């Protein structure tokens, strides 16, 4: 329709977002913390709920929930989400953690995501990552020189 009506568009760039500046010092320290915190386990009722919700939503999944901890990657893994945390990461050393709060393959901003995140499946994931943040911060405070190393790396990373 735009072509048929000779519609034109003027684009004005008002702001832009930077990619996340990864700090390997913090990444390794907080990953160590994540290995020390037990990952969530799910009840038969939660697994049944997950299976039912994925069927209702028409998702390609049998209700499988992720359990465990992925190995730490050698290189940063791009994630397809928008966040202003990436801007913050260019000012101070920053770490972000995430955990499963819904079945594999559930699209974000989908009603099935909200329904899973709002029940015990989501609560367990959120509590897990909160414990990991607390444990990681404890390790950061207890590991001599870690804050200085994180800042040093931050200053060296473009």
Residue ranges and their predicted role:
Residues 1-158:
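Metal-dependent amide/peptide-bond hydrolase catalytic core
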């Amino acid at each position: 329709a735009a072509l048929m009506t000779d519609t034109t568009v003027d684009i004005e760039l008002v702001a832009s977002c930077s990619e996340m500046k990864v700090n390997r010092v913090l990444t390794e320290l907080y990953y160590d913390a994540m290995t020390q915190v037990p990952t969530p386990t799910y009840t038969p009722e939660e697994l049944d709920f997950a299976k039912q919700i994925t069927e209702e939503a028409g998702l390609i999944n049998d209700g499988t929930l992720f359990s465990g901890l992925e190995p730490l990657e050698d290189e940063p893994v791009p994630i397809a989400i928008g966040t202003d945390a990436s801007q913050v990461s260019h000012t101070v050393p920053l770490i972000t953690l995430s955990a499963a709060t819904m079945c594999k393959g559930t699209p974000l901003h989908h009603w099935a995501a909200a329904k899973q995140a709002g029940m015990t499946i989501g609560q367990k994931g959120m509590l897990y990552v909160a414990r990991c943040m607390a444990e990681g911060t404890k390790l950061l405070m207890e590991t001599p020189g870690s804050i200085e190393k994180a800042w040093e790396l931050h200053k060296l990373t473009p």
